[in-house]
């Protein structure tokens, strides 16, 4: 299988972004949602993005942000990709001069394929754990057997991933990418460099085992 891309989300410090890049992560995520313990402001986000080495993708995570708020952030922070985690419609996600991912939470009984089809312009679909009232970062995994065989878009797997279970997740789901936040933290918003390395190694070793 092709190399599974890896995103380390909830980055709040330059040193954590650099540690993620050094470990081999393909992307880092910055949370622009004030209610999150991993939220960053524009100044900190710009500092982190400017410190990234070449070819590491910067992703901005938003939850029901207004166009005005989005515009202010995008004018100040050179993000490569947007990730929408709220109740945004397709038209809310488009027109920002950036490709985007739409996160869908795996609520039991939902038609995930149908919901994904409502975002034809999305670069990919991220599947996360459903917890009532929580848009993401729950730290809980969902039943991977519920993931459809074909979403019609690149699939990003999130929700409760850790260095201990991500290898099994990659083997079972075969996603385009995996996204982790709490599973590689020392505390909320502070990454553990050793756990980041272990997570990346677990993903890469699973691919080597299959070649």
Swiss-Prot record:
EC number: 5.3.1.24
UniProt entry tagged with the keyword NAD: no
Pathway annotation: Amino-acid biosynthesis; L-tryptophan biosynthesis; L-tryptophan from chorismate: step 3/5
GO-annotated molecular function: phosphoribosylanthranilate isomerase activity
InterPro entries: Aldolase_TIM (IPR013785), PRAI_dom (IPR001240), RibuloseP-bd_barrel (IPR011060), TrpF_fam (IPR044643)
UniProt catalytic activity: N-(5-phospho-beta-D-ribosyl)anthranilate = 1-(2-carboxyphenylamino)-1-deoxy-D-ribulose 5-phosphate
Pfam families: PRAI
Keywords: Amino-acid biosynthesis, Aromatic amino acid biosynthesis, Isomerase, Tryptophan biosynthesis
PANTHER family: N-(5'-PHOSPHORIBOSYL)ANTHRANILATE ISOMERASE (PTHR42894:SF1)
NCBIfam families linked to this entry: PRK01222.1-4, PRK01222.1-6
Family label: Belongs to the TrpF family.
Protein name in UniProt: N-(5'-phosphoribosyl)anthranilate isomerase
Lineage of producing organism: Bacteria, Pseudomonadati, Pseudomonadota, Gammaproteobacteria, Pseudomonadales
């Amino acid at each position: 299988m092709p190399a599974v891309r890896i995103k380390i989300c909830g980055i709040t410090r330059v040193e954590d972004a650099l540690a993620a890049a050094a470990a081999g992560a393909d992307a880092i995520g910055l949370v622009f949602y004030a209610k999150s313990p991993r939220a960053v402001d524009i100044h900190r986000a710009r500092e982190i993005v400017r410190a990234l080495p070449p070819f590491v993708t910067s992703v901005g995570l938003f939850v029901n942000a207004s166009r005005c708020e989005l515009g202010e952030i995008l004018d100040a922070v050179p993000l490569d990709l947007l990730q929408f985690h709220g109740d945004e419609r397709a038209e809310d996600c488009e027109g920002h001069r950036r490709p985007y991912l739409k996160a869908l939470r795996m609520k039991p009984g939902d038609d995930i394929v149908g919901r994904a089809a409502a975002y034809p312009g999305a670069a990919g679909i991220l599947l996360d754990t459903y917890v009532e009232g929580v848009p993401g970062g729950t730290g809980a995994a969902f039943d991977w057997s519920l993931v459809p065989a074909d979403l019609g878009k690149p699939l990003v797997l999130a929700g409760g991933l850790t260095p201990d279970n991500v290898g099994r997740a990659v083997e079972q789901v075969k996603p385009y990418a995996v996204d982790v936040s709490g599973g590689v933290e020392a505390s909320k918003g502070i990454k553990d460099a050793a756990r980041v390395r272990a997570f990346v190694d677990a993903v890469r070793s699973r691919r080597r085992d299959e070649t």
